[in-house]
Amino acid sequence: MGLRQDIDKEGAIVIPVFNEEGNIRAIVEEVRRSGIAWDIVAVDDGSTDGSRELLEKLPVTLISHPVNLGYGAAVQTGLRHAVAAGYGTVVLMDADGQHIPSEIPNLLAALEKGADIVIGSRLLGNSSVYRIPFLRRMGIKFFSALAKILGGTKIYDVTSGFQAMRRNVAQFLAEEYPVDFPDAEVIISLGLRKFRIAEIPARFRRREHGISMYSNPIRAFYYPFKTILASFIVLLRIIRGKK
């Protein structure tokens, strides 16, 4: 798994992938057309639909999990690779096509203003090109309030996976990233540890192919309870000085 020599060593774009055969080629090509010459680190999380075979043919650094370990594990694998490779900046984006690569320069510009991590938000301004379903929007608001109460940081779109971060954040999350449904838990953990978190409007779009993991009713039911419990555990660990 050698790095290609034509890559700008300044940063990496980490894309966790699970069964995104219908979307991933377009995402990689769109990133390249945007003029961003950074390494694209695609972490295939045990896909069963041909995503890995497709990624092997694309201009990416491919890391494969032998089985599906979950979104958080895939992100953590990508961050660990980026840190080990010496990248100073990491962009995290999804493989489902909802995150628009041409928005990345805006995230980086906000990072340069002093933030440690920048969140691309669907809820600021007229940022989305699609309407977020009502229940999902209510869930985002709930976890935003939870992050404010527990982490002391007001972020409107705490479930956004479209982020740019400095190396210090990447190093921390490479070891502390939650395995399942990280969302608010990550924001709370970063807020409690006094990382500087910024949020800017970012355009999103609808998924064109495949099925979101949130469409699974069992996982959707489990999600809020797991996140609340994990968030309190993070708070208790910090209070007790274990981390």
Residue ranges and their predicted role:
Residues 1-11, 152-153, 175-243:
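Hydrophobic helical membrane-anchoring modules
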Residues 1-32:
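N-proximal low-complexity "stem/linker" segments adjacent to membrane-targeting elements
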Residues 15, 27-28, 37-47, 63, ...:
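Short beta-strand/loop segment that forms part of the nucleotide-sugar
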Residues 20-23, 47, 100:
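Donor nucleotide-sugar binding loop of glycosyltransferases
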Residues 44-53, 97:
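A conserved acidic beta->alpha catalytic loop
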Residues 65-84, 101-180, 207-229:
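Acceptor/aglycone-binding surface of glycosyltransferases and processive sugar-polymer synthases
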Residues 87-88, 115-116, 195:
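Short, high-confidence coil segments that cap the C-terminus of an alpha-helix
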Residues 87-98:
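Short beta-strand-to-loop acidic/aromatic patch adjacent to the donor-nucleotide binding site
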